[in-house]
From Swiss-Prot:
Protein name: Circadian clock oscillator protein KaiB
Oligomeric and partner information: May undergo a major conformational rearrangment; in the free state forms homooligomers. When bound to KaiC switches to a monomeric thioredoxin-fold (KaiB(fs)). The active oscillator complex is probably KaiC(6):KaiB(6).
UniProt keyword S-adenosyl-L-methionine, yes or no: no
One GO biological process term: circadian rhythm
Keyword Transcription on entry: no
Domain comment quoted from the record: Has 2 forms, fold switches to a thioredoxin-like fold (KaiB(fs)) when bound to KaiC.
Keywords from the UniProt entry: Biological rhythms
Disulfide links within the chain: none
Domain of life per record: Bacteria
Note: The kiaA gene has been eliminated from Prochlorococcus during genome streamlining. It has been suggested that the central oscillator in Prochlorococcus does not have to be as robust as in other cyanobacteria because the former live in specific niches of the Earth's oceans; they divide exactly once a day and at the same time. Thus gene loss and changes in kaiB function compared to other cyanobacteria, can occur.
One Pfam family per UniProt: KaiB
Amino acid sequence: MNARKTYILKLYVAGNTPNSMRALNTLREILESEFKGVYALKVIDVLKSPQLAEEDKILATPTLSKILPPPVRRIIGDLSDREKVLIGLDLLYDELSDNEMFYSSDK
C-alpha cells in the first residue's frame, strides 16, 4: 500500500440495524488492518441526515463510497467479503500494484 495516499470514505447506513452494524464492523476491521493511519471514515445515518443521502444520490443502505483518491467508487449492500470490498473500491489493485505483483508479458 502506498502510505502517501489518504483514503476518504463515507459509509451510509440506516440506523443501528444488524446489517448496518455488521457493515461498519467489517469495514473498520479492513481499514485498521490494511489502511491504518491513512484513511478517514465518515458514517452517515440516512435516517438522521436524509439530506446528505439525497445530495449524494444514495438510494440503498449500506452504501460505501470511496471519495479520495479518485475515481469515486461505491459498493451497495453486503460488505462482509473483505476481498470484494477492496476490489469494489479499487483498493486491492492499488495495493497489489504498489507491491509490484503485476508483471508485464511485453518482454
